[in-house]
């Protein structure tokens, strides 16, 4: 199923089951990416690449998107979402933040955004611990 047909189906059927399925899809992608993040930290030559151009690209990608109309009359929704995604981008591997960005952009639904925001705020400390553990092991081997 392509992203376009996925979004069309989501707009037509905003059923609880379909929303739950979409959230589970996002959770699945995030969970599968944890080993990738750990592997990138074990091999510092991969993880030490400059992240600033990536953050600039993500920021420019999110600017034209109509989040305010999707989230209702909340004028701060656009800024909050961009700040949240940039925060994720600074604290996780590029693979993780791309997955989150694509997932949220495709959903355009406030309830799903809130659910994923809480989920990833719970996952972030775990990712931080993985980063610390991998960095410590790398320093010990030098």
Curated annotation (Swiss-Prot):
This is Putative regulator of rDNA transcription protein 16. Keywords: Membrane, Transcription, Transcription regulation, Transmembrane, Transmembrane helix. The keyword Transmembrane applies. It is found in: Membrane. One of its GO terms (cellular component) is membrane. It is a multi-pass membrane protein. Almost completely overlaps INP52. The chain crosses the membrane at residues 19-39, 84-104, 111-131. Identified in a screen for mutants with decreased levels of rDNA transcription.
């Amino acid at each position: 199923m392509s992203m376009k047909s996925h979004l069309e189906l989501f707009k037509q059927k905003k059923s609880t089951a379909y929303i739950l399925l979409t959230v589970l899809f996002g959770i699945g992608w995030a969970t599968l990416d944890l080993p990738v993040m750990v592997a990138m930290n074990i091999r510092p030559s991969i993880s030490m690449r400059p992240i600033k151009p990536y953050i600039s690209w993500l920021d420019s990608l999110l600017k034209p998107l109509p989040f305010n109309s999707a989230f209702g009359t909340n004028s701060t929704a656009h800024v909050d979402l961009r700040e949240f995604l940039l925060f994720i981008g600074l604290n996780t591997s590029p693979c993780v933040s791309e997955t989150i960005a694509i997932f949220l952009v495709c959903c355009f639904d406030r309830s799903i955004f809130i659910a994923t925001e809480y989920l990833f705020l719970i996952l972030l400390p775990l990712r931080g611990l993985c980063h610390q553990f991998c960095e410590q092991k790398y320093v010990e081997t030098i």
